[in-house]
């Protein structure tokens, strides 16, 4: 099975081999050393400040999205939330659940956030900004420099979900003034699902320490304290953390985050050039290297997903809700090659020849 979804993705042989090993006991000096290296490499690849901290949460990306909303914002805040799709809507829901005062900036599907969209909120006393850097459901990559400039001018705390864009697109946490970054194990880290990662700068750490969170599992004060000794407050997904360590070391050996950015850019451009004569419309006006969102001109997007899965042994990423029949997505994350792109494109051409596209 060839996997072009946006998570889980194709893992390297080294990472998969660790998944076959016996999971070790983790309250040891050896595991603590691995976790401390995980923290440092995550900070290095996110280009975070030396005094930033990394927290590993056993849970999906949504677990860390919720932990961030709970720990860095309070009812005294006034937060702007960009909603350009399913995951922007999730931040809106989290603010509603935790009673964080917020204003939703609602975007049409596939459209980027613009300076004009932000203009009405200049100087209006907002204290927080929540953004999915790459709205994975629609394939839109937002202009993080523009958002950073807006937050800097208005003295706004900036929390960024980089779950699908981390390692795929250029990102410099320190230079952009991002206070919190979130990512997950199953995207470009190319490991099994189960771990989400939060990187916090000193301002975010101050907010966490001052906030009285009504949660045991999601209180980041405990996670930060335990992280000082390379541990977690509760039993983590030990095997996945060991796989993350192998993957981070793999990235380091292969030239670091810039090489990963370039590799995924090459894969995305290669795929997009190979499908230019097929009956698809790319629906995003501002794309990430992580994924290509496609609208079939003559067929159901979900039917294409099923045909590729059942008849060709290829997974692409379907959409849900209103977009299920309209858009499917092709990911460029993980252990893929231009030859894999050709295999997918040949399958699509075969479907076209059979009148299925």
Locations of the language-model features?
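Conserved beta-loop-alpha segment that forms the PLP phosphate-binding cup at the N-terminus of a helix
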Residues: 51-80, 84, 88-92
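PLP-dependent enzyme catalytic core of the Aspartate aminotransferase-like
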Residues: 1, 322, 326-357
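A glycine-/small-polar-enriched, mobile loop at the entrance of the PLP active site in fold-type I
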Residues: 1-58
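Active-site C-terminal subdomain of aminotransferase-like
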Residues: 10-11, 186-270
């Amino acid at each position: 099975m060839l996997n072009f979804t946006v998570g889980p993705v194709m893992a390297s042989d080294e990472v998969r081999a660790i998944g076959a090993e016996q999971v070790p006991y983790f309250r040891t000096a050896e595991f603590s050393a691995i976790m401390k290296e995980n923290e440092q490499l995550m900070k290095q690849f996110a280009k975070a400040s030396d005094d930033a901290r990394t927290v590993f949460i056993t849970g999906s990306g949504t677990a860390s999205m919720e932990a961030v909303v709970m720990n860095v914002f309070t009812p005294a805040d006034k937060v702007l939330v960009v909603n350009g799709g399913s995951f922007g809507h999730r931040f809106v829901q989290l603010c509603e659940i935790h009673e964080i005062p917020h204003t939703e900036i609602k975007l049409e599907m596939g459209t980027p956030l613009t300076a004009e969209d932000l203009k009405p909120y200049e100087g209006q006393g907002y204290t927080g900004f929540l953004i999915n850097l790459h709205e994975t459901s629609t394939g839109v990559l937002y202009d993080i420099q523009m958002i950073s400039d807006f937050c800097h001018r208005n003295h706004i705390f900036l929390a960024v979900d980089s779950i699908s864009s981390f390692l795929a697109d250029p990102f410099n946490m320190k230079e952009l003034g991002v206070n919190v970054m979130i990512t997950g194990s199953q995207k470009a880290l190319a490991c099994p699902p189960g771990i989400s990662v939060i990187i916090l700068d000193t301002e975010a750490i101050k907010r966490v320490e001052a906030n009285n969170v009504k949660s045991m599992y999601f209180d980041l004060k405990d996670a930060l304290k335990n992280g000082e000794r390379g541990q977690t407050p509760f039993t983590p997904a030990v095997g996945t953390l060991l796989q993350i360590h192998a993957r981070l070391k793999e990235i380091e050996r292969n030239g670091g985050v810039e090489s990963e950015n370039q590799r995924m850019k090459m894969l995305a451009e290669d795929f997009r050039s190979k499908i230019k004569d097929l009956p698809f419309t790319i629906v995003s006006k501002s794309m990430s290297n992580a994924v290509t969102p496609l609208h079939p001109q003559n067929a159901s997007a979900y039917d294409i997903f099923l045909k590729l899965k059942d008849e060709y042994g290829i997974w692409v990423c379907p959409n849900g809700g209103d977009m299920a029949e309209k858009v499917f997505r092709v990911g460029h994350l993980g252990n893929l090659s231009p030859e894999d792109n050709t295999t997918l494109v040949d399958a699509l051409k075969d479907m076209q020849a059979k009148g299925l596209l």
